């Protein structure tokens, strides 16, 4: 976990790459891992990751931006602490300067919830995180299973994630927010097969709100990639 985050860009369609620049701005040999990268509609790059620079039992969630297409990186910003150590972060953007970061946060009693923090100023600052599904999943280790997000043209934010909830049954859920990440709808379970293990969901959302969610579905003797589609937001 002792890593440094670096970013390299190509200006010739991927034929060559320029020398990399450091993303994390602390000098310590410490965890900077499970990163995510997103480009918004105006060309800003948004990066999120799990960062152990404070030396606490649980690391924090950090973000940074590039305002010049990857040539330089802004000062790092701590969004929150108490982050699950190995569930990858996710970052995306929406209309009117909205930026969203998702991760799995550890609450008292080893309750692990998927949360989203929002920025209303293109990622300069972030508000306190909001719990998405209220799963109340107690798990005394890191599940290694991240969330995934997407936003449609009207600004609806969609989140998909894995949890085992209070019944300890593996499941993939989706929820959405129509108030720019202040609150979330009731969650909806996506996987319907019995005696399988749904894993690592990913979502893609087009501007009109057509949604595709894919995940791995493991059975005792095989592993499939399963897809769920919505055409009506």
What is each model feature region?
Residues 1-233:
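Extracellular, repeat-based ectodomains that mediate carbohydrate processing or recognition
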């Amino acid at each position: 976990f002792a890593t440094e985050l670096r970013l390299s860009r190509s200006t010739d369609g991927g034929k060559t790459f320029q020398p990399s620049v450091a993303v994390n701005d602390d000098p310590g040999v410490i965890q900077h891992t499970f990163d995510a990268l997103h480009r918004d509609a105006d060309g800003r790059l948004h990066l999120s990751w799990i960062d152990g620079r404070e030396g606490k039992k649980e690391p924090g969630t950090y973000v940074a931006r590039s305002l010049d297409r990857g040539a330089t990186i802004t000062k790092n910003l701590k969004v929150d602490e108490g982050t699950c150590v190995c569930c990858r972060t996710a970052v995306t953007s929406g209309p009117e300067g909205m930026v969203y970061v998702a991760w799995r946060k550890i609450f008292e009693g080893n309750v692990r919830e998927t949360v989203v923090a929002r920025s209303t100023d293109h990622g300069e600052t972030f508000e306190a995180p909001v719990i998405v599904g209220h799963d109340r999943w107690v798990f005394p280790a890191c599940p290694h299973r991240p969330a995934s997000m997407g936003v449609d043209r009207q600004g609806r934010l969609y989140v998909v994630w894995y949890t085992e909830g209070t019944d300890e049954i593996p499941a993939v859920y989706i929820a959405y927010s129509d108030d720019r990440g202040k609150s979330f709808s009731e969650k909806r379970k996506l996987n319907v097969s019995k005696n399988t293990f749904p894993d690592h969901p990913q979502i893609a959302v087009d501007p009109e709100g057509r949604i595709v969610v894919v995940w791995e579905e493991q059975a005792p003797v095989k592993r499939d990639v399963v897809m769920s589609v919505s055409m009506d937001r």
